[in-house]
Amino acid sequence: MSIGLSIVSCKKDSFLSEHWNHPLSTQRNPEVQLTQIESNLDPKQCANCHENQFKAWQSSFHAKSIGNGILWQKEILSFEEWNRCLHCHSPLPETKAEISETFQTHEILDSKRKHFPSGISNPSIQCASCHIRNQIWYGPPSRNLTANQLTTLQANLPHNGFKVQEEFESSAFCQSCHESPESGQKLNGKHLMEVYQEWENTSFAKKGIQCQNCHMPNRDHTWKGIHDPDFVRAGLQPSWSLTRTANGEIQIDAKLKSIGIGHKFPTYLIPKVYLRFFGKNQFGNRKLIEESILGRLVNTNLTEEYYDTRITPGNSHNVSFRFTLDEKAIKTLDWEIEVDPDEHYIRSFEESLREKGNLLSAETKKQLQLSLSEKKDSRYVLFTLSLPVPVSLPK
């Protein structure tokens, strides 16, 4: 059973079609003359001029795309499945050669020795994964120089400067690894990943707001997302009210509105968001009264969708219910919103450990256990709101 998602898609743009034509070619290009320093593609080398981007990348999930969570799966996937995962998790053939025998050809190993002379300590998504093809550097338009000024300076820039591609500021650039292919598996009429399509049909797209505007503000290379509490909070607005009904019950009306998210929240089938309502006594002890779950719940075999309660951009998830109050016990009501960024992975990994644990090698089992622990630790409380119990008016 493959736990990873196959996410190589087709693209309309000719540059992007070539740029993300997997498997990528090696960096060998005899027509380009570079010094040894310039041809060294280690991210640490890029940091000599791009220190801020390097430091941001180090803390990003792109820099952790080859970790325990994917490495343990190599033992249970076919060669074809494993290599398909690497198209996005480790795009360069030189980095793939570190973790896949398929890419340990003479040509690729020769390119790896030349362009990574100190070796590859981290075969994840690197600077060159997005910015370099055949020893030609690509990037977005300069924010400080005109096209003519940049052309004049190119000859004096390291690695012959770079070719400007506006696609680096387009959502389509991200589509390759964040959208299922058109021919990909569907559940209940929806692909496993549709974040680009979700965005494409929104006011965000109509206004020209791209993925990069939110996930790479000021060209920041941390690519914040569902795992970052502050980032998520900025896109949501919770509101609620308590009223006492004529028969003495408490009516709760709660609304979580998507105010700054350009796709469904949460996107993909991996995260879940729990809206929980508690009654709290004078000692601070809480009792769960009601729970509502946001997300797309799919079985671990990726063959059946149970529900999809995600919020579309600009809309809300509403929860309304009544309950009978024990006035002596409950003084305050709490609304807590908890995010589990890796819920589907946790469920899948727990099942794999339970059913396959004894069949895995010791190293692979340890990788699975470590990844499972890491993903369980990713949960966080997004909001906690409290309201006093409405007073009972005298009759």
Regions inferred by a protein language model and the residue ranges of each:
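Short Cys/His-centered divalent metal-binding micro-motifs
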Residues: 131, 178, 215, 219
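Outer-membrane beta-barrel translocator/pore domains, especially the C-terminal barrels
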Residues: 167-170, 223-225
